[in-house]
Design a protein with these regions (language model features):
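Outer membrane beta-barrel
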Residues: 1-108, 119, 128-135
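Outer-membrane beta-barrel proteins
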Residues: 12-16, 54-57, 110-114, 145-150, ...
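Detector for outer-membrane/organellar transmembrane beta-barrel domains
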Residues: 118-197
Length: 197
């Protein structure tokens, strides 16, 4: 069993920062989870990064930090997000011959009498393969908005291959909503890292 409490703050003022709408004090809004782990994998409850976000930033040579990071920012705020609370995740065990993955469901905390009781719900999954220099994964997600027309789907895929002297990255991310006049965003990422020193 385990737990994880993570928050951010400005090192000069101590003001709480990041992980969602932060108040004046320190908050565990980056991650706050409890987990049960074993040979079966891991079951995790709480607030954490969404699988769609994790998969989109895996193709970024800056990860999800730094001046050059794409940050996997969604065009449908509040629907396809960086982090979600009230979630349950299952993570595959690490002994599957290089295969890894995660399934995540988030409850939107709506009353059954609400006009759209699915608002805030989120379902995502990613499956990848990592072996030697190769790492690749595919991800899918569905986020529920304030109404059915605000619902959005996300699809992304990435791959990287470590050649020793350089490591190329390539990624693709697509998000589209369910409005009568559909809005679709597609983004591509190509990067390269090289060891120095």
């Amino acid at each position: 069993a385990g737990f994880w409490l993570e928050g951010g703050m400005s090192n000069d003022t101590g003001t709480g920062q990041g992980g969602g709408a932060a108040g004046p004090g320190f908050e565990f809004k980056r991650r706050s989870t409890i987990s049960l782990m074993g040979g079966f994998g891991e079951v995790r409850l709480g607030r954490e990064l969404t699988v769609g976000y994790v998969n989109s930033t895996a193709a970024d040579v800056f990860g999800d930090n730094g001046v050059g990071a794409s940050i996997g920012k969604s065009h449908f705020a509040g629907v396809i997000e960086t982090r979600k609370g009230n979630g349950i995740s299952y993570i595959l065990p690490s002994n599957l011959g290089g295969f890894y993955g995660q399934v995540q469901y988030v409850f939107g905390e709506q009353l059954s009498s609400a006009a759209y009781d699915k608002a805030g719900d989120y379902l995502g999954a990613r499956l990848g393969y990592r072996n030697g220099p190769l790492d690749t994964a595919i991800g899918f997600a569905k986020g529920r908005g304030a109404s059915a027309a605000d619902d959005a789907d996300q699809f992304n895929i990435f791959a990287s291959y470590d050649l020793g002297v350089v490591k190329p990255f390539i990624g693709f991310n697509q998000e589209k909503n369910k409005a009568a006049v559909q809005v679709k965003y597609q983004s591509y990422l190509l990067g390269l890292t090289a060891p120095v020193g």
